[in-house]
């Protein structure tokens, strides 16, 4: 299934089920491309997980690693717990990332995505350590001939672009999530994707409405029902020359399967 020339995929974690359940949902929707969460491959039962994945006739557009300490309850909680920023969990998270990189290579996938954490240039000591950690992970990815994709989220597009320009690393790109720009209240996603265009390798298809109370989360809604301006966003992707995958992500709502199916139908109907 495609939207124009872009493959349509789904984020495996959106379906909140095991590999067999993901496969069944994808078959019912009519898609064969997946953005695959791989933390389950790194613990007990990891080999069974990988075997189940390898038994599927999937195109894996990217893998994803998340970290156990991440707390998305509030904007403040994710600011201090997200990604590779917290010192207490750095060694554990570094090990998880390296394991995920090995899995990515084993599966023959080019991209490994993650939320890097909070980029805070105002705190020099934190910023230096954060920078060094990202460089070390990108170096490890590059040595394995894969690319680390940083997901948009807690910073404006300009802040992320400045960070990427400072890194100037060939093994770093961006997984652009337009809804996150709205959920975190960090700017207009259409303007943001233009700013980050040179780095954008992979897209999350997700929609949201901005909060009316500063300092609180926006509200995620089904694709096409929110403030991303889905048609204009897709048009912009064409204008910047994006040639990757559109991976549907749904992290809220009572009918995730139905919402993912709706998003796939809306995407595939775009001429």
Say what each PLM segment does.
Residues 11-15, 37-41, 65-68, 117-119, ...:
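Active-site beta-loop-alpha junctions enriched in small/polar residues
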Residues 35-54, 116-122:
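Glycine-rich, proline-tolerant flexible connector loops at the mouths of alpha/beta enzymes
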Residues 68-80, 211-217:
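Short, flexible, mixed-charge acidic loops at enzyme active sites
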């Amino acid at each position: 299934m495609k939207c124009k020339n872009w493959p349509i995929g789904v984020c495996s974690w959106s379906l909140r089920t095991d590999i067999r359940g993901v496969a069944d949902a994808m078959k019912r929707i009519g898609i064969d491309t997946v953005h695959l969460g791989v933390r389950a491959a790194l613990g007990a039962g990891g080999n069974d997980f990988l075997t189940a994945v390898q038994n599927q006739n999937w195109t894996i557009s990217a893998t994803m690693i998340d970290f156990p300490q991440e707390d998305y309850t509030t904007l403040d909680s994710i600011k201090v717990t997200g990604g590779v920023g917290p010192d207490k969990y750095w060694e554990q998270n570094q090990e998880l990332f390296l394991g995920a990189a090995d899995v990515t290579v084993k599966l023959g996938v080019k991209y490994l995505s993650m939320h890097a954490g909070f980029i805070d240039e105002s705190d020099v000591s934190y910023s230096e350590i954060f920078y060094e950690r990202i460089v070390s992970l990108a170096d490890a990815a590059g040595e394995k001939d894969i690319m680390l994709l940083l997901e948009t989220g807690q910073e404006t597009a300009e802040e992320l672009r400045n960070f990427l320009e400072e890194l100037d690393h060939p093994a770093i790109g961006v997984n652009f999530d337009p809804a996150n720009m709205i959920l975190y209240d960090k700017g207009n996603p259409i303007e943001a994707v233009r700013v980050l265009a040179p780095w954008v390798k992979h897209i999350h298809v997700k929609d949201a409405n901005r909060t009316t109370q500063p300092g609180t989360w926006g509200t995620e809604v089904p694709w096409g029902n929110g403030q991303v301006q889905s048609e204009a966003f897709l048009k912009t992707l064409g204008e910047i020359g994006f040639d990757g995958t559109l991976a549907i992500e749904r992290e809220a709502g009572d009918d995730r399967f139905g919402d993912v199916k709706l998003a796939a139908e809306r995407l595939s109907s775009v001429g």
